Design a protein with these regions (language model features):
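Intrinsically disordered, low-complexity Ser/Thr/Pro/Gly-rich regulatory segments
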Residues: 1-67, 72-218
């Protein structure tokens, strides 16, 4: 039997998709992007009201990250008025994309590597989660998942077990894709990297609960 919590998570997941479609009528792209970013943040805060969520850049001894849409900070983090936050105060660094491109995955993988390296140098137990939340991707689902180590088998009509040798984005900890398409036949999916660095694929609805669980576990 499906739990009420799962039904509510599916409701939230559908709301995110509907908000994306509703905002498509806005022609000013920065405004459209801001609305989507705020909607995702609000849905996370609805689940965990005490979280400190920001957007901006991370700073660490002369190094700055790229501007990012979603930063989860520790409770006692220094905030200020300039959207600049100390790397040591960060718990999650997440890009939000309407239609993620291959180049954006590459850029995120590069900045993630630097974030992970710097965090561990200061504190071996401090792992900053880095990932992407996207509504869709320019490449097909099969192409994207192949780059995360999951090959689609036509005979089995499903994905094979994770293959680390095929994974080219080893610094990205997670990917959430609502996988919105014009025909509405595609299903959302999530890739999560485990403690050992291997990826796990979630494609049974609702997948959003796996994303929400990050904020509960850390």
């Amino acid at each position: 039997m499906v739990s009420l919590r799962n039904e509510l998570d599916l409701y939230i997941q559908e709301l995110l998709s509907l908000q994306f479609k509703a905002s498509n009528g806005i022609t000013h792209n920065p405004t459209k992007g801001t609305l989507r970013e705020k909607f995702i943040k609000q849905e996370v805060l609805n689940q965990y009201p005490a979280l400190l969520l920001k957007s901006g850049i991370l700073d660490d001894e002369g190094w700055q990250s790229s501007q990012v849409d979603f930063i989860w900070l520790k409770e006692n983090a220094r905030v200020g008025n300039f959207n600049v936050y100390e790397l040591s105060d960060c718990k999650m660094f997440m890009e939000i994309k309407s239609s993620a491109k291959h180049s954006e995955f590459k850029d995120l993988n590069t900045v993630s590597e630097e974030i992970h390296r710097r965090a561990i140098e200061k504190n071996p137990e401090h792992h900053i989660l880095t990932g992407m939340f996207c509504y869709s991707t320019e490449a097909s689902e099969k192409t994207v998942l192949k780059k995360f180590g999951f090959k689609y088998d036509k005979e089995l009509q499903g994905y094979l077990n994770y293959d680390a040798e095929k994974d080219i984005f080893k610094e990205i900890d997670f990917l959430v894709s609502l996988n919105i398409s014009e025909d509405n036949e595609a299903s959302p999916y999530m890739v999560k990297r485990d403690f050992f660095g291997n990826c796990v694929l979630y494609n049974n609805n609702p997948i959003i609960n796996n994303f929400f669980n990050y904020f509960k576990a850390i």
